[in-house]
A protein has these predicted regions:
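Switch/connector loops and helix/strand junctions flanking conserved nucleotide-binding motifs
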Residues: 70, 108-113, 146-148
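"Short basic amphipathic alpha-helical interaction patches in structured regions
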Residues: 73-78, 112-119
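Short, surface-exposed beta-edge/turn micro-motifs
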Residues: 55-58, 95-98, 134
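Short, flexible beta-strand-to-coil junctions
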Residues: 61-67, 104-107, 141-143
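Charged, structured surface patches that assemble and position nucleic-acid processing machinery
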Residues: 118-174
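Nucleic-acid nuclease catalytic cores
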Residues: 90-114
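A broadly used, surface-exposed interaction patch
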Residues: 57-86
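N-terminal, charge-rich interaction modules
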Residues: 1-64
Length: 174
């Protein structure tokens, strides 16, 4: 499976809940997705709003033939800066998460280690105006190797079917 094929399959699962775009994305990324949600709590009638909670997620996808540790560091900085630029914390802001997916046909062992070490967090006004978590996942489309940071572990289930297919294809070749 190529990185572009894996990207298309991943984007298909995101399209259900996210606004996905392939054009006019921040270079060097291949695609972006955004999710916005606003929940309201009210008392007896909907006009008596007692609370609001706004949640956002900004997702960046990078698909290439290869990925090195240097690439991971460079892309990490670009994604974090752009994600932070898009966030507007205010009193009803709960969270705005930033996620990065690295898809490549050849990911170096150092790059996989680097992805696991990535850790970023931001709180706004001592969390009264929300917070930002940073999630990263790297997937080698040739071997099925998967690496993620602590918060990115919740995203690993998106790759389960692709990993099974890769394992079945490799067993069929033996």
């Amino acid at each position: 499976m190529t990185a572009d094929e894996a990207l298309e399959r991943l984007l298909k699962s995101f399209r259900q809940y996210y606004d996905v775009k392939r054009e006019d994305v921040l270079p060097p990324f291949s695609a972006e997705a955004e999710f916005h949600s606003c929940e309201e709590g009210y008392f007896l009638v909907k006009k008596a709003i007692i609370s609001e909670a706004e949640s956002n997620e900004y997702v960046f996808f990078y698909a290439a033939e290869s990925l090195s540790a240097g690439d991971v560091k460079r892309l990490d900085g670009i994604a974090w800066e752009e994600g932070m630029r898009r966030i507007n914390p205010h009193k009803d802001h709960k969270n705005s998460d930033i996620s990065v997916f690295f898809l490549a046909e050849n990911i170096s062992a150092d790059a996989l280690k680097e992805v696991k070490k990535l850790k970023r967090y931001k709180s706004y006004n001592h969390s009264f105006h929300g917070y930002t978590h940073y999630k990263t996942v790297a997937f080698d489309t040739t071997t099925g190797a998967l690496a993620y940071n602590r918060l990115g572990s919740e995203k690993k289930k998106l790759f389960g079917i692709m990993i099974k297919e890769l394992n079945n294809n490799q067993e069929g070749r033996k």
